[in-house]
Each structure stands twice: as structure tokens, then as C-alpha cells.
A protein has these predicted regions:
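Active-site-proximal beta-strand/loop segments in catalytic clefts of secreted hydrolases
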Residues: 32-34, 57-60, 90, 112-114
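Secretory pathway export signals and precursors
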Residues: 12, 33-36, 73
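Thiol/selenol-based redox catalytic cores and closely related redox-interacting motifs
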Residues: 73-151
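Local sequence-structure signature of Cys/Sec-based thiol-disulfide redox active-site neighborhoods
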Residues: 24-50
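N-terminal signal peptide c-region/cleavage motif recognized by signal peptidases
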Residues: 18-20
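Bacterial N-terminal signal peptides that target proteins for export
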Residues: 1-10
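N-terminal, post-signal-peptide region of Sec/Tat-exported proteins
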Residues: 41-91
Length: 151
């Protein structure tokens, strides 16, 4: 097999991967957030627009949920659980899909803080501003490495 054909096969497989995940049915996401957080609602909309089935749980304090999910050091304004993984903050749907395809031995993903330009922090009220940031893969011991860089 020549390199060109191999490249085409790899590209075709990569393009079909999101379709494969969707073919298995909608992925359920549970989100814990405070009742007044608008950017959390915008992130929930982003996830729904990308094919996830989202259930929200309004709580007064997301801290205990975050700690129980292994994300205490990577706080943002909401914590989600999807297929056994924690998703802390404004993580893009495509990174969650990649996580579900790769299935790493990890606690989950985190976008610490509230980075401008990330899903839910990208509405007109932010004036198109973007903050360079990383989505982190958080291991089960609390350590992390860059999963995807946004510059």
C-alpha cells in the first residue's frame, strides 16, 4: 500500500469516527451548575447542538460535585459527567467526542477558569474576544496534561 492510499484511508476513518459515535445513539450528559449562570446554559446549548442529550441539575454550590469528580484543582462554573468521565468547564463538544472515542484511563477533561472564546463564553456579549487556553486531560490522581491547545 502506498503512502497516498494509506493517508486517504486514515483520513476517511477519522472523518467517519464522529458518525460512528452518533450511530450508537445520543450520548447522555449530566451537568451540575448554579441556576443563574448564563454561560453554563450556553455551553449546554452547544452540547445539545452537537448531538448530546443533556440533563441539567441546578445546585447552589458546584464545589462538592467538582471535588467528587476529581476536578478540584481545575475549577470552572459547571461540572458534567458523560460515560463515566468528568467534564469541567467550557470544553468543546469535539474534545468530548474525542475523549469518548479514545477512552483513556483518566478522570476526564477540564477547561479551567472561564476562557473567552470557548463554547458558552463565545456569545456576542464577549465581543469576539478569545483567550488562549488549554483543555486538559486530568488523570485519576489529579495530574493533568494538555489534551488540546486553543490559540
Amino acid at each position: 500500500m502506498n503512502v497516498s492510499r494509506l493517508t486517504r484511508l486514515v483520513l476517511a476513518a477519522a472523518l467517519c469516527a464522529p458518525t460512528f459515535v452518533m450511530a450508537q445513539g445520543p450520548v447522555k450528559v449530566d451537568v451540575w451548575k448554579t441556576p443563574t449562570c448564563g454561560c453554563c446554559e450556553d455551553w449546554v446549548k452547544h452540547m445539545r447542538d452537537n448531538g448530546f442529550t443533556v440533563t441539567t441539575h441546578d445546585v447552589q454550590d458546584t464545589g462538592p460535585i467538582r471535588r467528587n469528580a476529581g476536578m478540584a484543582d481545575y475549577g470552572s462554573c459547571h461540572t458534567a459527567m458523560v460515560d463515566g468521565y468528568a467534564v469541567e468547564g467550557h470544553v468543546p463538544a469535539r474534545d468530548v467526542r474525542r475523549l469518548l472515542l479514545e477512552k483513556p484511563d483518566a478522570a476526564g477533561l477540564a477547561a479551567p477558569g472561564m476562557p473567552l472564546g470557548s463554547p458558552g463564553m463565545d456569545g456576542p456579549e464577549y465581543g469576539g474576544r478569545k483567550t488562549p487556553h488549554d483543555v486538559l486531560l486530568v488523570d485519576k490522581q489529579g495530574g493533568a496534561r494538555v489534551y488540546e491547545a486553543y490559540r
